Amino acid sequence: MKKTPLYEAHLRLGARMVDFAGYLLPLQYTSIVEEHLAVRRAVGVFDVSHMGEFLVRGEEALAFLQWATANDAGKLKVGRAQYSMLPNERGGVVDDIYLYRLGEEEYLMVVNAANIAKDLAHLQALAKGFRVELEDASERTALLALQGPKAQALLQGLVDVDLSTKRKNDVFPARVAGRPARLARTGYTGEDGFELFLAPEDAEPVFLALVEAGAKPAGLGARDSLRLEAGFPLYGHELTEETNPLCTPWAWVVKKEKAFLGKEAMLAQACRERLVGLVLEGGIPREGYRVLSGGCPVGRVTSGGYSPLLQRGIALAYVEEGAEGPFQVEVRGRAVPAALSPLPFVPLK
């Protein structure tokens, strides 16, 4: 089991540790709901050092990324970032990623922890036709996420740059608590916030400085409930190797006007199901629970849980394209009425 550079700090702060993607990570410190609401109302800090980081460099870096990713990497100016996906040749999704342009011929790609080896092998195979260098920088990169409406105010007291000039999806160098870092105004919670890329030896002093300044340590439980309220996908749940992204709420990522791996297969597929948001009248939905309409199964929950803001069970679910509802979710043998909800479940910042 791998440990992040913050493992000892988590234990000192009383974290309950769990295995996630081969890493020992904090599930929670106090309570998931408490940590969730701290991020929605103030500011929380997450250790996301398990995420993978690849550096893409070379004169054909952009051409390679245009082929390997579904979004238009050509629109990225230096110092900007975008959400994207790695399509496979069948029109499915190898992974969903964040891509940062660090220089004219240098990019940083952040991938999901469980997919690091798979993604690297996939990209290395694609890179053979391009003058490009791929480096797995995951082991020498620690990553913190500072999220919440008070994130900017808290972080401003610890950095040497004016954060008020930075927009969503900006990426820039800075010193945080005296340590060199790369900051990005990005996140996975639906709140404003920053992600901090650091050398492993700088992670603990920066993390503790953020906590001392008032950021509440938050674990994987709150990270998942926050992204669920925000209607964000989790790879392996809403997105898989078999998912056509054009049949999801994230179809906007796919730029059909450019060439990319699997484009023809993706465009040729008819959508047989659609992803919906559901708010239950009672009970807590979980992955795999059946969605019913008129007593018949018409879909399945891909992510579910309790929404601390709505104080209800909420779910992301795939239902048959023609299914109209009203819907119910089968919770422990009981058909619980579930109202369709637009996504996100809560307003994004």
UniProtKB/Swiss-Prot annotation:
<dbReference type="InterPro" id="IPR029043">
    <property type="entry name" value="GcvT/YgfZ_C"/>
</dbReference>
<dbReference type="GO" id="GO:0008483">
    <property type="term" value="F:transaminase activity"/>
</dbReference>
<dbReference type="InterPro" id="IPR006222">
    <property type="entry name" value="GCV_T_N"/>
</dbReference>
<dbReference type="GO" id="GO:0004047">
    <property type="term" value="F:aminomethyltransferase activity"/>
</dbReference>
<comment type="similarity">
    <text>Belongs to the GcvT family.</text>
</comment>
<dbReference type="InterPro" id="IPR006223">
    <property type="entry name" value="GCS_T"/>
</dbReference>
<dbReference type="GO" id="GO:0005829">
    <property type="term" value="C:cytosol"/>
</dbReference>
<comment type="function">
    <text>The glycine cleavage system catalyzes the degradation of glycine.</text>
</comment>
<dbReference type="GO" id="GO:0005960">
    <property type="term" value="C:glycine cleavage complex"/>
</dbReference>
<dbReference type="InterPro" id="IPR022903">
    <property type="entry name" value="GCS_T_bac"/>
</dbReference>
<protein>
    <recommendedName>
        <fullName>Aminomethyltransferase</fullName>
        <ecNumber>2.1.2.10</ecNumber>
    </recommendedName>
</protein>
<dbReference type="Pfam" id="PF01571">
    <property type="entry name" value="GCV_T"/>
</dbReference>
<dbReference type="GO" id="GO:0019464">
    <property type="term" value="P:glycine decarboxylation via glycine cleavage system"/>
</dbReference>
<dbReference type="Pfam" id="PF08669">
    <property type="entry name" value="GCV_T_C"/>
</dbReference>
<comment type="subunit">
    <text>The glycine cleavage system is composed of four proteins: P, T, L and H.</text>
</comment>
<dbReference type="InterPro" id="IPR028896">
    <property type="entry name" value="GcvT/YgfZ/DmdA"/>
</dbReference>
<dbReference type="InterPro" id="IPR013977">
    <property type="entry name" value="GCST_C"/>
</dbReference>
<keyword id="KW-0032">Aminotransferase</keyword>
<dbReference type="InterPro" id="IPR027266">
    <property type="entry name" value="TrmE/GcvT_dom1"/>
</dbReference>
<keyword id="KW-0808">Transferase</keyword>
